[in-house]
Amino acid sequence: MATGTPAHEFRELDNAELENRLKDAKEELFNLRFQKATGQLTNNRRIGTVKRDIARIYTVLRERELGLSVAPGAEA
């Protein structure tokens, strides 16, 4: 079963690690879409899971930008 990463796990990461995770997730989504187009995708649910993970990462980054949450190790 394709399960995503909970938001609280993303909140424990610093901004640099979140950016790396975002880049990796976007690459994975690209590859999954390519597999779907060529008929090689075996788990269709994974596309939605990766898209939700990307949205969660963007949400955590935006919360930090607005000052609603603080990155770990950073003092307010």
UniProtKB/Swiss-Prot annotation:
Any single Pfam family the record assigns to this protein: Ribosomal_L29
GO biological process: translation
Cited PROSITE patterns: RIBOSOMAL_L29
Keyword Endoplasmic reticulum: no
Keyword Nuclease in record: no
Gene3D superfamilies registered for this protein in UniProt: 1.10.287.310
Molecular function GO labels: structural constituent of ribosome
Family of the protein in this entry: Belongs to the universal ribosomal protein uL29 family.
Name used for this protein in its record: Large ribosomal subunit protein uL29
Gene of this entry: rpmC
